[in-house]
Amino acid sequence: MTTEAASMGAAGATAATASPPGKWPSARVAYYTLFVLILSTTCSQLDIAIVPYLGPAIKADLHLSDYSFSLMVGVSFGLFYTAVGIPIAWLLDRFSRKRLLALAITVWSLGTAACGLTQSFAQLFIARFFVGAGEAVNGPAAYSITSDLVPRERMPRAVAVLQIGSIGGPAITTLISFFALTAFLHMAPLHGPFGPIRGWQLIFILVGLPGVLIALLMLFTMPEPKRHTIPNQVSGVDETRRHIGGAILQVFKDYGVALAYIGRHWKVFAPMFGSLFISSLGTGAIAFQAIFFDRRFHWGPARLAGLNLIPNFILVPIGLFIGAMVAEHFTRKGRADAALLTHIIARFVGLGAMFGALMPNPWAAWALFTLMIFSIGLGGPSQNAAFQIVTPTELRGKMTALYLFMYSVVGVAFAPVITGFISTYLVGEGNLKMAIFLPTAIFGPTSLVITLLGLKPYGREVERLKALEAGAA
C-alpha cells in the first residue's frame, strides 16, 4: 500500500490538487516508516496464510470435520477482533499508534507460537483467539500512519507499497511452508513441555517468534508522523479527553461521530462497505485450498506451496505494479475516481477464478486460483487507497477499523464457516468443490455490481474533498 513521500509523487498530480510543501515527512523518513510497516503487515499475514497449508495435517491429527476446521480457522480469530478491534481503533485515533501496534505484534506473535504447543481443538481455538490481534490492530494502525506520510493524490501508490506487506506475508509463508512441509511434516514428534510437537506445530512456533523482534524494531527505531487534518471537516470528536475515566462512554461517542459521518455520506460509503461485506462472504476457498487439492487431486500441501510460489513471488508483484500504473493513468486523465475504478477493473479480471473448483484436472483448477491471487495484487491496493482518500484523518482509525471489520471478521472468520458448513452438512465432504464454488459464484458478482453503483458518488466526493483541502491551504 503506499508510497513515496515527497519525491515519490504521482506523475499526474497537478498544482491545483497537490498538497502544500513542507507538511509531509521527508522521503527518507517515509521510506523507512513504510519498510517497518511492511514488516509488521507481513508478520500479521503469516499465520493467516500458513494455516490452509497445515489444514490436512491439523484435521488428521485432531480428527476435525470440515466444519470444525472452519471454526478453528475463522471464528476463533474473529472473536478477538470483534471484542478488541473496535476499542483499539479508538485508542489509535488518540494515542501513539506505533506503541499500540508494537504491543499488538507481540501479542499475536506469541499467540501464533502458542498454537505450536496445543494438543487439542479447544487449546488451538484459544491460542488463535489472541492471533486475532494482528488484523484487529495492524490494519487500522498501518493505514492511519501511511495516510500521514503522503498527500492525498499520492495515496494510491503509497498504499500499493504498503500492500507489499499483505502480499509479502503469504509469499514468504508460501516459501516457508514449501521447505517446512517438505522437511517436517512427516517427522517423528519432538518432546515438548505440554506434549508431543508434530511438524505442523513446529511450523507455528517458527513463524510466530520472529514477530517479537519486529515489535522491538518498531518501538525503538520507527518515527510516528504528525497527523494531518482538514479544518472543520468533522465535528464532535473530543481530541483532549485522554484520561481513563469516561473513556468507555467516549468510545461510543466517537464511534457515533464516525457512523454519523458515514450516514451523511451514505452514497459514498454504503457501496464500499456493502461490497466488501458481500465479497468477503465468498472467500472461504482460501482456507480450504490445500484441503481441496489434497482431497480431490492428491496434491500434498508441500507441492501446492511450491507451485504457489509462482503467483505469490511473480504475478502478485506484477499486479501491484500494473495496478499502481493504471491508477496513476486514470489520475492523469483527470479521473477523480481513479483508485476505485482500478479496483473495479481488477475485480472483472478475477471473476473467472470462481470456476476453479469445478475444473476436471488440477492444473486448470490451480491456474484459475492463481488468477484470483493476481487480481488481488492488481486491485487490492486501489480498494484500500480509495477508502483512505475519502476518510477524514481524525476518524481514520475508527472508520478503517469498521471497514476492515468487513474482511477480517466476515471474510477471515465467517467465510470459511460458510464453506465448511456447506461441505459437512449440505453437499457432503466428498463434494468440497461445490462448497467452494457456490459462495464465490453468488457473492462475487453481487459485490461487483454494488461497487459499480458507488463509482459516480465516490468521484464526486473526491472532488469535494479536493476543494476543501485547497480552501484550507
Task: Please tell me what each predicted stretch does.
Residues 83-122:
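Conserved MFS/SLC helix-loop-helix module at the cytosolic interface between two early adjacent transmembrane helices
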Residues 336-383:
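C-terminal transmembrane helical hairpin of 12-TM major facilitator-type secondary transporters
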Residues 17-27, 225-270, 296:
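Juxtamembrane intracellular "pre-TM" segments in multi-pass secondary transporters
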Residues 74-89, 310-323:
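Central cavity-lining transmembrane alpha-helices of secondary-active solute carriers
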Residues 162-224:
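Helix-loop-helix hairpin linking two adjacent transmembrane segments in secondary transporters
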Residues 127-166:
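Cytoplasmic helix-loop-helix junction between adjacent transmembrane helices
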Residues 52-83:
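Extracellular/periplasmic helix-loop-helix junction of adjacent transmembrane segments
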Residues 51-52, 261-316, 320, 376, ...:
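Extracytoplasmic gate region of multi-pass secondary transporters
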